[in-house]
Curated annotation (Swiss-Prot):
Family: Belongs to the CN hydrolase family. Apolipoprotein N-acyltransferase subfamily.
Organism the protein comes from: Parasynechococcus marenigrum (strain WH8102)
Subcellular location, principal: membrane
Protein name (record): Apolipoprotein N-acyltransferase
Function (record text): Catalyzes the phospholipid dependent N-acylation of the N-terminal cysteine of apolipoprotein, the last step in lipoprotein maturation.
EC main group: transferase
Entry's Gene Ontology molecular function annotations: N-acyltransferase activity
GO cellular component, one term: plasma membrane
GO biological process, one term: lipoprotein biosynthetic process
Transmembrane segments: 12-32, 49-69, 80-100, 122-142, 161-181, 189-209
InterPro entries, A to Z: Apolipo_AcylTrfase, C-N_Hydrolase, C-N_Hydrolase_sf
Cell compartments where the protein resides: Cell inner membrane
Xref: Pfam families: CN_hydrolase (PF00795)
Length: 465
C-alpha cells in the first residue's frame, strides 16, 4: 500500500471516518488525527470534499433510523430511498463546504508552496466562524467544536470563553501541528504538547461554575411513546390517563413543576383534573393566525387553559418545515404537516424563574442560548423527541447540552420523549435521571445562577452592535 503520506485518497477516506467517530464517541482522540489528515489534503479540493463526505455520513448515520416512513403515509418501496437520500444530502452539503474551504486554502499558500502560520490561523478562524454561523441555520447539527464532549471536559472548559467556534479553531490548529510533526517524523513536538497541556489546564480551571442563587426542584416526565404510534387512536385514548399519572407522581416528588418533552400536548389540550396537582411545562402545538407552531406551554393550577412561553424557531427541514410544494409531493415528509418558526429569542421571563429554552434541534445553537443567558436566564431547559433515532443521536444531543452548560455557566435540564432525560450541571457534569426508553418521572434539583461567562458577554456585545 505504501506510505500513507503518498496516498491522498486513502488519507481522505481514513480522515473522514476518524472525524465521523468523534461526535459523541471518540472526541479529540479521533478528531485531531482526522484534522491532521485533512491538512495533508488542504490543497486538494476533491480529496478534502471526500473527507467531509465520509465524516458527516458516519457521524450522521443515525438519520437512517428514519426508515421505515410508512407511518407518515410514504409507500413502503420509497421509504428507504428517501431516508438514504436525506442522509446523503447532508454528506454532500459537507463535501461542498470542505471544497470551498480547500479552494480558499489554495489562495492562502505562498507561491513556493509553503505556509505562513498566519495563513493557517486564518483558515482555522474561518472554519470556527463558519461553524458559529451555521449553528444558527437549519442545516447544521454538530461540528468540530461540539465533538470535544463528552470525552474531554477539561478542554471543553475553554468554551466558557471561546464558545464552540473557538474550540473548533483550536482543534484545527492542533491538527495542523500534528500534521507538521508527522511530516518531520516527530521532531520539535514539545511546543505542540505544551500548548495542548496548557489548554487543558486553563479549561479545567475555567470549569468552576458561577455562584448559585437558589435551588429549583423540577420533575421530568419521559413518556417513551414511539413516534410511529403517537398519533394512533389507541395512544390518543391512553394519553390523558398517562399524563394524569405523571402529574400525580410529580406531586409526590414535591417538585415545583413537571416538565414534559417536545410535542407532548395536542392542539387545544384541556386538563381532566381541575386544578392540576402541580404546574405543567410541556412541549405542544398551537395555532397562531392560521400557522401551526411547536411551542413550550405552561399550565398552572390557578389558571384555565395553557399559556404559550416560546415557539420553536429553528425548524428541521422537511421533518417540520415544508417548502411550498404541491400537496402530493409533501406526503410522507412531515408528521405534523408543516410548522412555522416563532421568534428567534430563546429567553422566557416567567414563573418559576427566568430561563432559556432550546426545543430539540435548537440545542446546537449556542449563540442563541448565550444571548438569552445575557438577557437574564438563570437556567436552561431543553425538550426533545429523538425517537425513532438510535442511541448515537442521544449521545450527541447530551454532548451539545454539556457544551451549552459550559458556555453559559448554567445548569441544563434535558427532558426527552425516549431520552436523554438528564441534569447537566454548569461545569458540564451529567446526572442521568432516567434510562433511555423508560416511561417514568424523576426529580431534578438544579441551581439558578446569574453571573455571566465571558462567552455570554461576548455574544451579547456582538449582538447588541
Amino acid at each position: 500500500m505504501g506510505d500513507l503520506r503518498s496516498q491522498p485518497l486513502l488519507r481522505a477516506v481514513l480522515g473522514g471516518l476518524l472525524a465521523g467517530l468523534a461526535p459523541g464517541v471518540a472526541g479529540p482522540l479521533s478528531m485531531l488525527p482526522a484534522l491532521a489528515l485533512l491538512w495533508s489534503l488542504v490543497e486538494r479540493p476533491r480529496d478534502a470534499a471526500l473527507w467531509g463526505l465520509f465524516g458527516v455520513l458516519l457521524s450522521h448515520r443515525w438519520l437512517l433510523g428514519l426508515h421505515p416512513l410508512t407511518w407518515m403515509g410514504l409507500p413502503a418501496w420509497l421509504s428507504l430511498p428517501v431516508a438514504v437520500a436525506i442522509w446523503l444530502s447532508c454528506g454532500v452539503a459537507a463535501a461542498l463546504l470542505l471544497l470551498l474551504w480547500s479552494l480558499l486554502a489554495r489562495l492562502c499558500r505562498r507561491r513556493d508552496g509553503t505556509w505562513r502560520f498566519g495563513a493557517v490561523l486564518l483558515l482555522a478562524l474561518v472554519w470556527g466562524a463558519a461553524e458559529l454561523l451555521l449553528e444558527g441555520s437549519p442545516l447544521f447539527w454538530i461540528g468540530v467544536g461540539g465533538s470535544v464532549l463528552p470525552l474531554d471536559r477539561p478542554l471543553a472548559g475553554l468554551g466558557r470563553w471561546l464558545g464552540s467556534g473557538g474550540l473548533a479553531t483550536l482543534q484545527l490548529l492542533w491538527g495542523w501541528g500534528l500534521w507538521q510533526l508527522w511530516r518531520r517524523r516527530g521532531r520539535r513536538c514539545a511546543w505542540w504538547l505544551i500548548s495542548l497541556l496548557l489548554a487543558h489546564a486553563m479549561g479545567a480551571l475555567s470549569l468552576s461554575p458561577p455562584p448559585a442563587l437558589a435551588a429549583l426542584r423540577l420533575g421530568a416526565w419521559q413518556p417513551a411513546i414511539p413516534t410511529r404510534e403517537k398519533f394512533s387512536p389507541e395512544r390518543q385514548r391512553r394519553f390523558q390517563s398517562a399524563l394524569s399519572s405523571a402529574l400525580q407522581q410529580a406531586q409526590s416528588l414535591k417538585v415545583e413543576a413537571l416538565v414534559a418533552p417536545e410535542g407532548t400536548l395536542p392542539f387545544r389540550w384541556q386538563a381532566d383534573e381541575d386544578p392540576l396537582p402541580v404546574p405543567l411545562i410541556s412541549g405542544g402545538f398551537r395555532w397562531v393566525r392560521g400557522q401551526q407552531r411547536s411551542s413550550v406551554l405552561l399550565a398552572r393550577p390557578d389558571r384555565a387553559g395553557v399559556e404559550p412561553l416560546v415557539d420553536k424557531h429553528r425548524l428541521v427541514p422537511l421533518g417540520e418545515w415544508l417548502p411550498p410544494l404541491p400537496a402530493g409531493l409533501t406526503r410522507g415528509l412531515s408528521a405534523v404537516g408543516g410548522l412555522q418558526p416563532g421568534d428567534a429569542s430563546r429567553f422566557v421571563n416567567v414563573w418559576p424563574s427566568p430561563f432559556a429554552v432550546a426545543i430539540c434541534y435548537e440545542i446546537s445553537d449556542g449563540r442563541a442560548l448565550a444571548k438569552a443567558t445575557a438577557q437574564g436566564a438563570e437556567w436552561l431547559l431543553t425538550i426533545a423527541n429523538l425517537d425513532p433515532y438510535p442511541q448515537l443521536l442521544q449521545r450527541q444531543f447530551l454532548a451539545l447540552a454539556q457544551l451549552r452548560a459550559i458556555e453559559t455557566g448554567r445548569d441544563v435540564l434535558s427532558v426527552a420523549n425516549t431520552g436523554p432525560t438528564a441534569l447537566v450541571s454548569a461545569d458540564g457534569t451529567v446526572q442521568r435521571l432516567l434510562e433511555p426508553q423508560t416511561d417514568a418521572v424523576a426529580a431534578a434539583e438544579l441551581q439558578r445562577r446569574q453571573q455571566l461567562t465571558g462567552y455570554s458577554r461576548l455574544v451579547w456585545a456582538w449582538s447588541s452592535r
